[in-house]
Curated annotation (Swiss-Prot):
SUPFAM superfamilies with a match to the protein in the record: P-loop containing nucleoside triphosphate hydrolases
Protein name: Probable GTP-binding protein EngB
Gene: engB
Keywords: Cell cycle, Cell division, GTP-binding, Magnesium, Metal-binding, Nucleotide-binding, Septation
One GO biological process term: division septum assembly
Taxonomic source organism: Pectobacterium carotovorum subsp. carotovorum (strain PC1)
Pfam family membership, one: MMR_HSR1
PROSITE patterns noted in UniProt: G_ENGB
Amino acid sequence: MTQQYNYHMTRFIISAPDIRHLATDSGIEVAFAGRSNAGKSSALNTLTNQKNLARTSKTPGRTQLINLFEVTDGVRLVDLPGYGYAEVPEQMKIKWQRALGEYLQKRNSLKGLVVLMDIRHPLKDLDQQMIQWAVDVELPVLVLLTKADKLASGARKAQLNMVREAVLPFMGDIQVEAFSSLKKLGVDKLRQKLDNWFSTLEHAEEEQEAE
């Protein structure tokens, strides 16, 4: 049975430069990843109905740390460093990418990945790499096509259908939805997916403990 979580109760736990400085690797985490201007912080703020939970910046590439938020005991959302922003110094970019890759490959509690892309510019190389990595380790993916309010209804549907077809060759557990923080479009789909992931995994953990 799918439990409904109170995302408005989500609270900030810690910011860390790398995996070694994070909280204990137990429980369940779902990570939010995307290019530096994809609207990750806005999506997290909209999901939790908290204006300042995740800091939004007019300057893409400011989210340099892995940020952890607790929904309830043992259930966390993770805001990962934005990737692919050209104006960040190369050395800093490499450092972020290393922290990002290390988290994605070594974090045992990571159980789902939300990949955010601007609906007008979806499936850039790094976006596709992120999806491929998730599929390789059998991690379910929710793709959110953000800033959907920037397109008229017909164009929005066309982009949604195009991306849904484009991810089929990945052969993974991938769902694609349009999303707008401004218009609250797709927020219900995001909540449903998170509820489903967290409920399924919490139930599985309880069964393991009972054995």
